[in-house]
Amino acid sequence: DLTCGFGIDAYFLSQNFEEITLIEQNTELLDIVKHNWEVLGRKANFINQKLEDFLKNNKEHFDLIYLDPARRDNHNRKVFLLEDLSPNIIEIQEQLSDISTEILIKLSPLIDIQHLVSSLQNIYKIWIIAVKNEVKEVLVYLKKTENQPEIFCINLQSSEPEFHFNLDDEKHCKSEFSIPKKYIYIPNNSVLKSGAFNLVSEKFGLRKLHQNTHIYTSEEKIEHFPGRIFETEEINSKAIKKGEQFNIITKNFPLKPEEIKKKYKIKDGGNQYLIAVKSLSGNHFLVGKLLD
């Protein structure tokens, strides 16, 4: 682990390896990690050194290199571009490849997947990890391969299936479009983060509402979808009654949920959903329920 910190990631990684080496430049922090690992009965090689110095002087070869780059700059501002992280992954990627054939990097959920793919060499796999539909981490696994990177979209603490694909899959797909039908599908945020908008349409046989509305529809219910499924019907906005309760969702729509709530004098909550969306034919209000 080249970015030890408090050693939490390294502790769990170490359960899968016979030996682990931790690099940390902060002496006091490394002393804390040493103490914690002794208490937990876990052994490691502790090296109090700057990452750059370690890479320059190291003669060993490792089965796996792990990094979790710092996501704040010298002014404590959040950063997420690869070139702004510390260490700068783009600058050191060749040095990393010299000491291991497999490299695992944990990155911010804000990282742009296309930027990632265009900036790093030898991307083997990417995991986009969400917890309860909030993207928490992006993991990138570097290993020399002739294949296109595989992308895995995972929504933990949900019953939704994993969705995975390679980049060529998305490039060769096209979406077909439709007005809203009986069932509405909203992919979870790990899938949306991946950018596989056309592949979702083609793989599940769904129609998209609009190029910029990443919501899908079908007349028959499709099972095992990586996201939420709603059974809906379209209503005229004049049919929305004052004081009714809705969970409001807007996608590519002129009004935000708070503006809809204020305009139509409706309340949050209840079991019903009001979905305000834009299709190629115009704006729609859909009322329905979330299916299990």
Located regions from the model:
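SAM-dependent transferase fold signal centered on methyltransferase-like domains
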Residues: 1-292
